[in-house]
Amino acid sequence: MSRVNFDQLLEAGVHFGHLKRKWNPAMAPYIFMERNGIHIIDLYKTVAKVDEAAEVMKNLAKQGKKVLFVATKKQAKQVVADKAASVGMPYVIERWPGGMLTNFPTIRKAIKKMATIDKMTKDGTFDNLSKREKLQITRQRAKLEKTLGSIVDLTRLPSALFVVDVMKEHIAVREANRLGIPVFGMVDTNSNPNNIDYVIPANDDATKSVEVILGAICEAMNEGLQERKAEKIDAEAAEEAPKRERKAKAAVKKERTKKEDDDALNANVAGKFAKDRKSTRLNSSHITISYAVFCLK
């Protein structure tokens, strides 16, 4: 079953492309027709591409991989932030920092700087600074938070990029291509799909369009995360089973040993008792005989 249907896409305006004069010929396979000078995207192909991309994204999430969502255009920023956060993925919705991927160690240093400032605030070091220094550091922290706050948990290069408007985010796409990182993208009729690994032909200018596509993608990722969680629980249970079995066997063995010890002790006591009783009987007989002899005398 498809994750999106034709009617959903139609209602969200996913089919609206750009003016014919702005089109990119490489998008011809995904264009259904032209109407009033505007290209109309073939939604059946969009459905197929969404399903394909969603399945791959689901597997990435299931493997615990990180996917970086990128959308700096006004119409898509909030949608991307909400959807990416819902599945615990990093995102960039402000200006793309040059070298974000190709110079990732430098980006990590900037993120660590944020952590250092936070530590200064907690341990009281910040309070010992002058007003001017406090102001400078506060501004620096706010600037870093705005640009990098949403990727704090990205400790290594992402396994994939999901881009809304590949033309606007061409720097991000180029960096990913250079590093061999797969790119998923919502590609409109004015963009070049050749550098995108998983093309989703769609209107990237309408908020509803972005919301529908991302909704399907993130739903698939959430399924992958849930499956990963379930597998982890099963693995832990499978790991615990032999331990519980060993404990049960040890308890049974301990109980058996205790019973054997008790039986041995009881047998020993019984034997001693029987021996004492026999000895007592012999002594009694000896006394009786001695008394009889004495009487005869």
What are these regions (language model features)?
Residues 13, 69, 161, 213:
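Residue-level signature of catalytic and energy-coupling elements of molecular machines
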Residues 1-3, 226-281:
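Intrinsically disordered, compositionally biased charged tails
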Residues 276-278, 282-297:
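Single conserved hydrophobic/aromatic residue that forms the stacking wall/gate
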Residues 2-66, 72-73, 77-120, 131-134, ...:
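N-terminal cationic and glycine-rich segments that engage phosphates or anionic surfaces
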Residues 87-194:
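Long, charge-patterned amphipathic alpha-helical coiled-coil/hairpin "stalk" segments used as oligomerization
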Residues 78-79, 171, 288:
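Phosphate- and divalent-cation-binding pockets in alpha/beta enzyme and binding domains
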Residues 171-234:
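Short glycine/threonine-rich loop/turn motifs
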Residues 15-18, 188, 286:
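Histidine-centered active-site/metal-ligand motif
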